[in-house]
Amino acid sequence: MKEYFQSIVKELFKNIQSDEFLIINFDAEESSFVRLNKGKIRQPGSVKQISVSLSLSNREKRNLKSYIRLNGSLKRDLATLIRTLNYLRRELPDLPKDPYLLFSTSIKSTDVSSTQQVFDDRENLDYIFSKIKSLDLVGIYSSGYIYTGLANSLGQFNWHSDYSFSFDYSIYNESNNAIKLNYSSKNWSNDDFDLILEQGIKKLSILSKPLQTIQKGEYTVYLEPSALNEILDMMSWGGFSYKANKIGTSPLHLLNKGEKSLHQSVSIDENIKDGLSANFNSDGFIKPETINMISNGKFSESLTSPRSSLEYSVDHNASSTSEYPSSIDMSPGKIAEHEILSTINNGIYISNLWYLNFSDRNNGRMTGLTRFGCFVVEAGELVAPINTMRFDDSVYSMLGDNLIGLTEKRELLIDSGSYEERSTSSARLPGAVINNFKMTL
């Protein structure tokens, strides 16, 4: 795939005029997908797709972009790309100047190619089926390479490739109630899969017990990493963005100003080095390996795009234009896995949350529903499933004053989204035990 991109780059740059600057961004994947239902393969398939965006600029800071799907035939694709380039060139003079246009002019080429051993999907699926014979399982197994490339007409060339998989699935009991599970990583481990499945089966057995209705109020709860990920995803809607904090639309703007703080055990990084996303942005700037966004409960550094750096006269850290994290890494705590239930003692175990939204964005307050495998805990034991409940609480409470602690063990959660293409977003998170968690309905 890299050689294919290099061939495109070589030919396109032959067509660039002296007063033009061209950036070529390349995205591709070679993926396998297997849909399972009732523990059997129902729909296997594979996807190989290539996309290229051309960004043409001139000395007057005019810029125009075009996004093209390619078919893998170099001759036909080059003809399409050259026609597109000519279209951009023709339209460019009629566009207004872009005062915040900024791209890298210092040549910093990189090549980060996956060196891990590629696993056999058939072997993995055979192993899965050997373990789920008696289970009603529904899910999607996806795996394969994801490629990202960039080249500009100054001679910079960047390449990133990574191999990963995601098995996103649910297991059902006879009453059609489900436990949702996910196993995703860069390397398959039978032991890791067994552990996740065994924990799911144990929860499924408790899910068969009569539903226990709980009343609205404040509870001690445990948020599994997948549930905590929903909270952090909401925090990321402008929370770490320099521009959003500057104009006051960030849900963490009070944290950014120093008017609020989180628990001192909370540290959150953008960890590009250990994630799946590329270490360069679409303008050719190289991202730091790690950006410490929250340190010991205090706001540390925003994600700042090149556009924001020009608009507000500050340094940038090669963030994307959206200034949204793609590889969240939250530091672990001190609660051992076998201590989670005893730490809750009496409360609620929450496996998943969904339908989250802000109830008071200015104060970092959000609301959402419990989902899939949430249980009453009594005397440190899971005793019964609960009715669906709505929570409404502030991040400054959940990860601040009311945070009892984070778990020692963390999980890598790879975004299983595949709209248009497989996602490269990921999060490595602990679980969280929280006191006075507010259930409202």
Model-derived features: positions:
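Active-site bordering "gate/hinge" segments
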Residues: 1-278, 286, 295-298, 381, ...
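Dual-mode signal for accessory low-complexity, basic/Gly-rich regions
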Residues: 255-441
